[in-house]
Amino acid sequence: MQWDSVTLKNMPGYFIEQSEVEGLDYTTMCLWAEEVELSEPRDTKGETEEAVKEILKTHSWSWLGEEGKRIQKVLTGVDEEDEMETFRAWERYLEKTLAFPFDAKVLGYQDKGPLRSGDKVSVKKISLVDDHYGIIVELRRGRKKYDHPLCDLEVINNDSINYQPVKDYRVWFANR
């Protein structure tokens, strides 16, 4: 049985979050035929679809637990279909949150350029937002200056105030 928009709009947020974390579908419920009474529809299929869209605006990252809550907070009020708008939301958040400079290491295979996985760098500032690579930061390795995607960096000091925001951005970038 699929829930209608009336039920979905009245569904407690914690139930939706728990369902997302556990990978369950909160929009339906399986019942035996004898547990259901035939009734008249209270809405249309379109209204139900619209209710689900509204729920996703506040719960689309709930499946990630606490990390998802932080990501959702950054994206509150943002049309997630507009990729540049979401990148700009991250840029605003990171500009306010990060303390520059900070030390990081390069992650993953780097097929081009002078930086390699494991290189230690000093991140100086956010340079720009790119529609393909996301947040680009200015960094230094030794005396050389480079621009590099933030999604390919990890803050070295786990206790740094920069660690969690950069990790949250990386997780969002990988799952967008």
Residue ranges, per PLM feature:
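Basic/aromatic-rich interaction segments and small domains that mediate binding to polyanionic partners
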Residues: 1-95, 100-168, 172-176
